[in-house]
Structure formats: structure tokens, C-alpha cells
């Protein structure tokens, strides 16, 4: 039998249920997105061989990790053989190793060539040099990259228009932190020791992990530029302090963003998410590595081999010497051979 006592308690039950429903989601913590540990900025730093001043307007999650770009190779320094001289050594540039890892394919020999950046070509006009060097990474990648600072400027204009000064302050701190990191990267990436200047062309075979093989060709000096020496030097004490200060600024600005309006928080969140999407697409569409005044690009199609020995024998025939292959452990030395690889 129905008890009217329960019917009288129905409004109280509904009110309790209404209180149990969570309140509408707020966007006060949108600035915390900037603290996500993403690697779009570090990869971009490696692909262009440093930083550009326009990077200060590229605000993406993980921007406080830019100084970790020298770890982009995941600790790999692959064995390399110079097929023209017989020397065996390692590629010491983490950015170059990262690029070679990205173009390498298991069981395939990928050929890449090092050439001078179009900005160094004095045979063409200054205007053509500027345009070619600007779009050396490819037109789609360049357009996607420029959309990042355009997005930042657009969001700042809107925040100023609606009078959300907390949001403007948060973005201003993001930009200030980026300025510090960009300046430090530019200081660390200045070209240093690359060995003695030599003439002639070089031909390198690089053995990467997971049975990925890359053949890198170009002039000897250009090959040294992208493989030898130190890319990012260690942080000095003032630089270390500056980077720490910039990192704390990013954390502080994420907290400061809590005071932004709902619209401002939404704009900041959309800016960070859209920018990291654009930069990730830009990185994936970038078809070359820029290192100092050189550009590394793939050449032709990858060649598939059933055995690594088959690949080694073919290259030995082309180079007309096997000391580099012996030094890399690709082939056994011939009986009675007096030629020995040179390890450097």
C-alpha cells in the first residue's frame, strides 16, 4: 500500500539530488594546460638548429622544456663510417641524430644530402635568397608555423578589447619566459669547433638503432657542420638562473590565469591547444633539417635489403674499399689485408 509519508518527502529528495549534481565546469584552470610535458617546442628547436625571435609568440604546452632539446636523440650517438677515408666515428649532434631517426626505416637504406642553405647562394638575387630560405622547410610547414604567432596576437587583441587584463598579464608572462629561453638557446647554439677545413666530397654510412641505415652525402665541410662538435653547449651559471626564472614565470602565469574571466580563460585554453596542434603539424610536415648554414634533405627513395650484409657489400663495391665496413663490424676483414680502419 502506498505511503503518503514518502510522497511528502519527494521535494526534499529532489533537492538533495539537485545538490549532488556537479556545478557547471569552469575554465579557471585553463592556464595549467601550458604545463603539459609536450615536446613540440624541443622538436622544433632541433629541426631548425636553434631558435628564432618569432618563437617568442609561439605559446604552446611544454614551452618550458625548450632547453632539453639536446636530449632529443634519446641518448643515441650512432656509429658512422666514412666510405671515402675509411674513418669510423660517431655522430655527435643530437639534432642531426633525431632527424636521421625520423627519416630512417628498418631494413632500408635511406639516402640524404647535406647542402648549403639557400641564404648562402650568392648566384641568385637577395629577394630569391630570402624567399627560398624562408620556405626551405616547405610551404605548408612554414604557413602552419606563422599561424602560431598570428593566433597569439589575435588572442591578445581580443583580451584587450574585452578588458581582461589578467589574461593579458598571463600571456605577457608566457611571452617573457619565451624571450628568455629563445635568447639562451641562441647563445648555446652558436657554431663552435667543427674540425679542420677540408676539400672534397664525403660519403657517410650511419647505423641507427632498430636496423635503420642512412647514407649521408655532401662536401666534407658540410658533413662536419651537421655531425661534428657540440650543438648546444652546457648552460652557464647565469643562463641556468635565467632558465629557472623563466620556468617559474610559466608556472606563475598559469596560476595568474585563474583570475582571468571565463571568456579569457577559454581564449587562453584555445590558444594553447590550437598552437600546439599547428606546431605539431608543422614539425611533421617539415621535410629537412636546418643546422647552421646547412640543410639536410632526403634524396630518392629508400632501398630495401633482406640482409644488412647485402647492403654493406654493395656499398663496399661502390666505395672500392672495405676498411670502414670492417671497422663498423659489417664485414669480415679479408685474409692478408693490411688496410685497417681509422677510428676517430
Model-derived segments and their meaning:
Residues 121-165, 231-238:
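Cytosolic-side membrane-insertion boundary helix
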Residues 192-237, 277-344:
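Cytosolic/matrix-facing juxtamembrane and C-terminal tails of multi-pass cellular membrane proteins
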Residues 228-288:
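Transmembrane helical hairpin unit
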Amino acid at each position: 500500500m502506498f505511503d503518503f509519508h514518502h510522497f511528502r518527502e519527494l521535494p526534499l529528495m529532489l533537492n538533495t539530488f539537485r545538490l549532488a549534481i556537479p556545478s557547471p565546469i569552469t575554465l579557471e584552470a585553463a592556464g595549467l594546460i601550458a604545463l603539459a610535458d609536450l615536446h613540440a617546442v624541443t622538436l622544433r628547436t632541433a629541426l631548425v638548429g636553434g631558435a628564432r625571435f618569432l618563437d617568442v609568440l609561439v605559446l604552446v604546452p611544454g614551452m618550458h622544456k625548450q632547453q632539453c632539446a639536446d636530449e632529443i636523440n634519446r641518448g643515441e650517438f650512432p656509429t658512422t663510417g666514412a666510405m671515402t677515408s675509411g674513418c669510423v666515428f660517431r655522430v655527435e649532434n643530437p639534432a642531426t641524430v633525431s632527424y636521421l631517426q625520423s627519416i630512417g626505416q628498418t631494413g632500408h637504406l635511406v639516402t640524404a644530402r647535406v647542402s648549403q642553405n639557400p641564404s648562402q647562394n650568392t648566384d641568385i638575387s637577395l629577394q630569391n635568397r630570402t624567399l627560398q630560405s624562408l620556405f626551405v622547410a616547405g610551404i605548408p610547414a612554414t604557413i602552419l608555423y606563422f599561424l602560431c604567432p598570428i593566433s597569439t596576437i589575435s588572442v591578445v587583441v581580443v583580451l584587450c578589447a574585452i578588458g581582461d587584463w589578467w589574461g593579458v598579464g598571463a600571456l605577457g608572462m608566457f611571452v617573457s619566459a619565451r624571450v628568455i629561453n629563445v635568447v639562451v638557446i641562441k647563445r648555446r647554439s652558436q657554431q663552435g669547433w667543427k674540425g679542420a677545413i677540408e676539400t672534397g666530397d664525403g660519403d657517410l654510412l650511419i647505423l641507427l638503432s632498430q636496423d635503420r641505415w642512412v647514407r649521408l652525402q655532401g662536401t666534407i665541410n658540410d658533413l662536419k657542420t651537421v655531425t661534428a662538435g657540440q650543438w648546444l653547449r652546457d648552460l652557464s651559471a647565469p643562463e641556468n638562473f635565467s632558465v629557472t626564472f623563466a620556468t617559474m614565470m610559466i608556472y606563475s602565469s598559469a596560476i595568474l590565469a585563474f583570475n582571468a574571466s571565463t571568456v579569457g580563460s577559454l581564449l587562453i585554453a584555445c590558444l594553447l591547444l590550437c598552437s600546439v596542434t599547428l606546431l605539431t603539424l608543422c614539425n611533421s610536415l617539415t621535410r629537412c633539417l636546418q643546422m647552421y648554414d646547412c640543410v639536410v634533405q632526403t634524396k630518392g627513395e629508400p632501398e630495401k635489403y633482406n640482409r644488412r650484409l647485402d647492403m654493406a657489400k654493395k656499398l663496399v663495391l661502390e666505395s672500392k674499399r672495405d676498411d670502414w665496413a670492417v671497422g663498423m663490424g659489417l664485414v669480415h676483414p679479408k685474409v692478408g689485408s693490411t688496410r685497417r680502419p681509422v677510428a676517430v
